[in-house]
Amino acid sequence: MYLVEEAKKVAEMILSSVNAIAFTGAGISTASGIPDFRGPQGLWKKYSPELASIEYFQKYPDAFWQFYSTRMKSLFEAKPNRAHYALAQLEKMGLIKAVITQNVDGLHSVAGSRNVIELHGNMRKSYCTSCLRSYDSLEVLARVEKGEVIPRCECGGILKPDVVLFGEPVHGIYEAMRIANESDLVLAIGSSLTVYPANQIPLIVKRNGGGLIILNGEETPYDEYADLVIRERIEIFLPEVISHIQSLHRSS
C-alpha cells in the first residue's frame, strides 16, 4: 500500500510541474544486470577505481583494455529494463523534458528517450586518442577479444572508449546545468549523489525553488533536502507512477 501512495504522490508532482527532468545513476540499470559502483555488490568492491582512471589508461593501456573489455561486453549484453522504458514514456507524454545521466551504458537511448545528456560519455562509441576518429565499440571489442591487446587506429593512435575516466572533465555539464536551471522538478533516480560535479544537478533545481524526489536504494547526502525519499525498487516503482498518471488523466 505504501508503494501505491508514494507512486500517486510522485505522479501528482510530475503532473503539476511545468519543466520536470530526470537525473539517473547506476542504480537504474542494476535490474538490467549491470552492477552499480558503490553498493554492496558494486563494481568498486571487486575492482580498484584506479583501473578506470585516465592516468592508468595512459600508463597501462593493455591492462586497461583487459579490464574495460570485460565491462564493455557485459554492458553490450544488457537490455533496458522497465525503468528505462518508463522514463522514455514520460518524455513521450511531454511530462519530462530531459534525462541527465551518469551512466555510460546507453540504455536510455535504446529504450527510446530522445533528449539524453550523458555526463560520463557512452561506451558504445570509441575514438582514436591521436586523430579523434570515431569507432563503433562493438568493432573494437571484437578486435580485443581476437587478441589485439591494445586496439589502435589506422594512424597508429591508441583507441579509447568514449567514456569519462577518473581525472577527465565531464561531458555536457554546462548544458546539464542550463537545463537544471530551467527545471521546476527533478527525479534523482539510482544515484548515490556523491560524484562531483554531476551531483550538483539536483541541488540546482532545489536551490531555485523546484522539487526534488530521490529514488534510490541507499541513503544519499541530499536526502535531507528532498521533498520525497523513496526506497522502492526502481523498475517496479516508475511503471507504477506511469499507471497513476494515466489514471489521473482519465479522471480529469
From Swiss-Prot:
Enzyme class: transferase
Binding-site positions, NAD(+): A26, T30, F37, R38, Q102, V104, D105, H120, S191, S192, N216, I234
GO CC terms in record: cytoplasm
Short name of one Pfam family: SIR2
InterPro entries reported for this sequence: DHS-like_NAD/FAD-binding_dom, NAD-dep_sirtuin_deacylases, Sirtuin, Sirtuin_cat_small_dom_sf, Sirtuin_class_U, Ssirtuin_cat_dom
EC number: 2.3.1.286
Reactions mediated catalytically: N(6)-acetyl-L-lysyl-[protein] + NAD(+) + H2O = 2''-O-acetyl-ADP-D-ribose + nicotinamide + L-lysyl-[protein]
Stored Gene3D superfamilies: SIR2/SIRT2 'Small Domain, TPP-binding domain
Subcellular location: Cytoplasm
Positions with a binding annotation for Zn(2+): C128, C131, C153, C155
Annotated cofactor note: Binds 1 zinc ion per subunit.
Ranges for domain Deacetylase sirtuin-type: 1-248
Active-site residues per Swiss-Prot or TrEMBL entry: H120 (proton acceptor)
Cofactor(s) of this protein: Zn(2+)
Amino acids binding nicotinamide: F37, V104, D105
Keywords: Cytoplasm, Metal-binding, NAD, Transcription, Transcription regulation, Transferase, Zinc
A Gene Ontology molecular function term of the record: NAD+ binding
Similarity comment: family membership: Belongs to the sirtuin family. Class U subfamily.
PANTHER family from the UniProt entry: NAD-DEPENDENT PROTEIN DEACETYLASE, NAD-DEPENDENT PROTEIN DEACYLASE SIRTUIN-5, MITOCHONDRIAL-RELATED
Name under which the protein is recorded: NAD-dependent protein deacetylase
